[in-house]
């Protein structure tokens, strides 16, 4: 009788892997969900495609063309995928040899870069950001040997600030002919002037990640994009699954990216920015809040006295925030998604009542 278990049959790196702790996986029984940087209210769409007996297009033409027009790039510079998370993984699969190459990222930042690399068996290297959360370019330069993909989130999740554009240029020069630089622009709709999409002609090794999950209010759709030069896109097409977007997803995405859909998105962004400033101003006056950091996104990072107790107290009241204590340099920090005015008021009232 064999004593080998199913777990024994698994790859060693998978057995040792800690899965990404998404907001939904962490759970909670709240009624004020401010932990996943989602848009706070639902948007409505009507399905127009009824051909569910047929496989969808591999790269739906209407979605690609609409997004290219919106982003100011050519259709051949756009790849659509199951969320930006799939784009993160595709870039590693296309450019990194497991057991040989490495990726590099700069914590505190988004957690899926490391999870995607570790799943595939690719080494992760980290260069923590400077005290102002900008790139440590010297540190990156020192660790670039063997690195094939560098991930930089801007605006950065969870800190909320933009990376200095001159630092991006320096990084792109450092990596020219050596590695792909990936600018994760999941939150760029909240600061569109900072996008690097206009740099693609200048830097053939630049790739940009985008999503419909944030400003487009479609987190449940799972639709993201990679913007890059055609040579990069063609390589990604070799490793992507044949039908990444279902017909209903492609249908809704095309509607969201129509001229009317873009107008509606920009109205949502203006509303969220106004609410963000209201919440920042209120947080700065609350005694348990030590520091509120500037944000270019739909969330706010703040440092609290007794942050773990504050987090649990609000959790028990049904207000679910995102604890960032385990991230480098974020001791005492909680991240708060900007929600509705009613949700902001629930947070403000609960924090004012904290005795710490």
UniProtKB/Swiss-Prot annotation:
GO MF annotation: an example: pyridoxal phosphate binding
GO BP: L-histidine biosynthetic process
Keyword line: Amino-acid biosynthesis, Aminotransferase, Histidine biosynthesis, Pyridoxal phosphate, Transferase
One Pfam family per UniProt: Aminotran_1_2
Residues carrying N6-(pyridoxal phosphate)lysine: 214
Catalytic activity line of the entry: L-histidinol phosphate + 2-oxoglutarate = 3-(imidazol-4-yl)-2-oxopropyl phosphate + L-glutamate
Pathway of action: Amino-acid biosynthesis; L-histidine biosynthesis; L-histidine from 5-phospho-alpha-D-ribose 1-diphosphate: step 7/9
InterPro entries the record matches: Aminotrans_II_pyridoxalP_BS (IPR001917), Aminotransferase_I/II_large (IPR004839), HisP_aminotrans (IPR005861), PyrdxlP-dep_Trfase (IPR015424), PyrdxlP-dep_Trfase_major (IPR015421), PyrdxlP-dep_Trfase_small (IPR015422)
Catalytic activity, EC: 2.6.1.9
Segments forming a coiled coil: none
Domain of life per record: Bacteria
Cofactor(s) this protein requires: pyridoxal 5'-phosphate
NCBIfam families the UniProt entry points to: hisC (TIGR01141)
Quaternary structure note: Homodimer.
Similarity comment text for this entry: Belongs to the class-II pyridoxal-phosphate-dependent aminotransferase family. Histidinol-phosphate aminotransferase subfamily.
This protein's name: Histidinol-phosphate aminotransferase
Primary gene name: hisC
């Amino acid at each position: 009788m064999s004593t080998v278990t199913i777990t024994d049959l698994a790859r060693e790196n998978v057995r040792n892997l800690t899965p990404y702790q998404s907001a939904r996986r962490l759970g909670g029984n709240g009624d004020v969900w401010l932990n996943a940087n989602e848009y706070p209210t639902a948007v409505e769409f009507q399905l127009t495609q009824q051909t569910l007996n047929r496989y969808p297009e591999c790269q739906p033409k209407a979605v690609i063309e609409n997004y290219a027009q919106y982003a100011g790039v050519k259709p051949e510079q756009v790849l659509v995928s199951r969320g930006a998370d799939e784009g993160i993984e595709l870039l590693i699969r296309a450019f990194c040899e497991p057991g040989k190459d490495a990726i590099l990222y700069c914590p505190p930042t988004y957690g899926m870069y490391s999870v995607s690399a570790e799943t595939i068996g690719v080494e992760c290297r980290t260069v923590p950001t400077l005290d102002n959360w900008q790139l440590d370019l010297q540190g990156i330069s020192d660790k670039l040997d063997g690195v094939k993909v560098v991930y930089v989130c801007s605006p950065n999740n969870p800190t909320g600030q933009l990376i200095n554009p001159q630092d991006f240029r320096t990084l792109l020069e450092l990596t020219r002919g050596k590695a792909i630089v990936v600018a994760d622009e999941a939150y760029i709709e909240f600061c569109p002037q900072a996008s690097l999409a206009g740099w693609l002609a200048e830097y053939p090794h630049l790739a940009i990640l985008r999503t419909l999950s944030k400003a487009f209010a479609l987190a449940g759709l799972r639709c993201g994009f990679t913007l890059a030069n055609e040579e990069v896109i063609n390589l990604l097409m070799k490793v992507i699954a044949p039908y990444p977007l279902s017909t209903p997803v492609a249908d809704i995405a095309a509607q969201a990216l129509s001229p009317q859909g873009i107008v509606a998105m920009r109205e949502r962004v203006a509303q969220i920015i106004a609410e963000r400033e209201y919440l920042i101003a209120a947080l700065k006056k609350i005694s348990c809040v030590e520091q509120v950091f500037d944000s270019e996104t739909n969330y706010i990072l703040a440092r609290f006295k007794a942050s773990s107790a504050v987090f649990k107290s609000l959790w028990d009241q049904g207000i679910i925030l995102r604890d960032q204590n385990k991230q480098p340099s974020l001791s005492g920090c909680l991240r708060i998604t900007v929600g509705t005015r009613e949700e902001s008021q629930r947070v403000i009232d609960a924090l004012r009542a904290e005795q710490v």
